[in-house]
Swiss-Prot record:
It comes from Rhodopseudomonas palustris (strain ATCC BAA-98 / CGA009). One of its GO terms (cellular component) is plasma membrane. Catalyzes the conversion of heme O to heme A by two successive hydroxylations of the methyl group at C8. The first hydroxylation forms heme I, the second hydroxylation results in an unstable dihydroxymethyl group, which spontaneously dehydrates, resulting in the formyl group of heme A. Pathway: Porphyrin-containing compound metabolism; heme A biosynthesis; heme A from heme O: step 1/1. The lineage of its organism: Bacteria, Pseudomonadati, Pseudomonadota, Alphaproteobacteria, Hyphomicrobiales. This is Heme A synthase. Heme binds at H264, H322.
Length: 368
């Protein structure tokens, strides 16, 4: 049920169109990053040049220089010795495209943001949030290089912990933008019991934990192992000695292929169960029921994709669909949490912080 509707406003539409574009670009970048990882292309560029690195090699000499740099790292020597220049170009373009998208996102975010600030289109409440998002984006570039650097000296791949950190930060930025878009939208304030609000926030938090766990699975390539379901390693619950053989025990949570995949499965079961309970509660109280149903259905589809990804040993196409569906789940979880936790004060804050001269007749993001 709803108890109060915010007055229609077009004052944030231009800002929302801009933020929707940024969110879409981040989603594309996450998928390109996934393809870069799955094709084992992430270490093909061994230098970090935030400005001059935007240009790819343009001559044979430059291509050979880039290839020679790749030949110096363990991944080439131990896994790809004998690779041809044409084969190197294939993995190079994936990593270069991923980095280029990062630069494009930075420009698409910063330049309109400065313009909106200059025009007075963004009030104090949103300025702070949007500057924080920009700072997180700048940090993400450094985290990306920190991740790549982990695979340049001793390892033949990047650290799965750093990979998970890199992906998690991208998803935090994406979620922050979606949350801001939803809060800027015209919509009714939902009257719901505290229990429903708490479970919506719990679903969002657990979704982030699950996404981090999934990134660990991807970084370890653990999805190519234990390709049975519902059993894993021959049992519903593997032997404790195999789950916890690393010392100290907590290393198993990050380094043990079996433990990492088992955790990812258990978190999926917990998330699906919580979403089902949340949906039942929402249907019973008629509070944000549509959002609860959408989230539950998305999680059901994602769980199904996850099962098939495991059974088929994580082929690239299926793994990418699984990752794309994770973005859908995160989007719906953010929208549901914001919908149920927004207060009347939050809903009217936009009217204090917007300028009316930037109206664009569009509705780029769902408002209910």
């Amino acid at each position: 049920m709803t108890i109060a509707a915010a007055p229609p406003s077009s004052r944030f539409r231009a800002v929302r169109i801009w933020l929707t574009l940024v969110a879409a670009l981040i989603a594309v970048m996450v998928l390109v990053g996934g393809a870069t990882r799955l094709t084992e292309s992430g270490l093909s560029i061994v230098e970090w040049k935030p400005v001059t690195g935007s240009l790819p090699p343009l001559t044979d000499t430059q291509w050979h220089a880039a290839f020679d740099g790749y030949k110096q790292i363990p991944q080439y020597r131990e896994l790809n010795a004998g690779m041809t220049l044409d084969q190197f170009k294939t993995i190079f373009w994936w990593e270069w495209s991923h980095r280029l998208l990062g630069r494009v996102i930075g420009i698409v975010y910063l330049l309109p943001f400065l313009w909106f600030l200059w025009r007075g289109a963004i009030g104090p409440e949103w300025k702070r949030a949007l500057w924080i998002i920009f700072a997180l984006g700048a940090l993400q570039g450094a985290v990306g290089w920190w991740m790549v650097a982990s695979g340049l000296s001793q390892r033949t791949e990047v650290s799965q912990v750093r990979l998970a950190t890199h992906l998690s930060l991208a998803l935090i930025i994406y979620a922050a933008i979606v949350w801001t878009l939803r809060r800027m939208a015209d919509g009714a304030r939902v009257a719901a019991p505290v229990r429903l609000r708490v479970t919506a926030l719990a679903l969002l938090g657990l979704t982030f934990v699950q996404l981090y766990a999934g990134a660990l699975v991807a970084g370890l390539r653990a999805g190519r192992l234990y390709n049975t379901w519902p059993e894993i390693d021959g049992a519903l619950i593997p032997d404790a000695a195999r789950l916890w053989f690393e010392s100290p025990w907590w290393k198993n949570l990050f380094d043990n292929h079996l433990t990492v995949q088992f955790d990812h499965r258990m978190l999926a079961y917990a998330l699906w169960t919580l979403a089902a309970l949340h949906m039942i509660d929402a249907l019973r109280t008629r509070a944000a029921a549509r959002g609860a149903v959408q989230l539950f259905l998305a999680l059901t589809a994602q769980a199904t994709l996850g099962i098939f990804t495991v059974l088929y040993a994580a082929p690239i196409d299926l793994a990418l669909v699984h990752q794309a569906m994770a973005l859908v789940v995160l989007t719906l979880a953010v929208l549901q949490a914001e919908r149920l936790t927004a207060t009347r004060k939050d809903r009217t804050a936009r009217d204090r912080g917007a300028a009316g001269r930037l109206a664009i007749p569009s509705e780029p993001f769902p408002s209910a």
